[in-house]
Amino acid sequence: AVNRQKLPEGIAGLTRDAKKAGVKFGIWIEPEMINPKSELFERHPDWVIRQPNRETSYYRHQLVLDLANPAVQDHVFGVVDSILSHHPEVAYFKWDCNSPITNVYSPSLGERQGNLYVDYVRGLYKVLQRIAAKYPRVPMMLCSGGGARCDYEALRYFTEFWCSDDTDPYERIYIQWSLSKFFPLKAMASHVTDWNKKTDLKFRIDVAFG
């Protein structure tokens, strides 16, 4: 849900202002995560990956939703679908996932806990497949704490990967060169930043364009 205190007009207001400024609007989302103080957590505590009868370990004040659970898959798809269907002006989105799984237990798998990682990834791919099928023309970047989600299956559903949070142009040369041995150049997202200000702007732009 949109925080109306911060964004009184919601996402619609942002897309409208972006259009007035002559730029396209993109959104950065993290739909696999959940805040333990959220309404969703209060309604569905069984949707969260966490070990029962043990102290819960948090990462960045978040927990991970159990994508091995089909109901959670439907919810995550619904979140993204709601954004894109209600706001067709959204021209791009970045899908991030910054938290490792710190409480390894799926309430939905019962005695099949050994399947958690495999079923989680399969559940994620099911969600991504549905999104890509419904919104094939929306460019999407996949990120996970940097480049932790660079894999061929994911590339079926995303336009590009975020290779690394390291945007130093000198270091980025090695990152992009190494990644190019496995993935096409057009799959590597790269930004021009002020990291390593000793380099001139043209060099940073040249590296970002690969």
Q: Which ranges hold each PLM region?
A:
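N-terminal/domain-start segments enriched in small and hydrophobic, helix-friendly residues
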Residues: 79-121
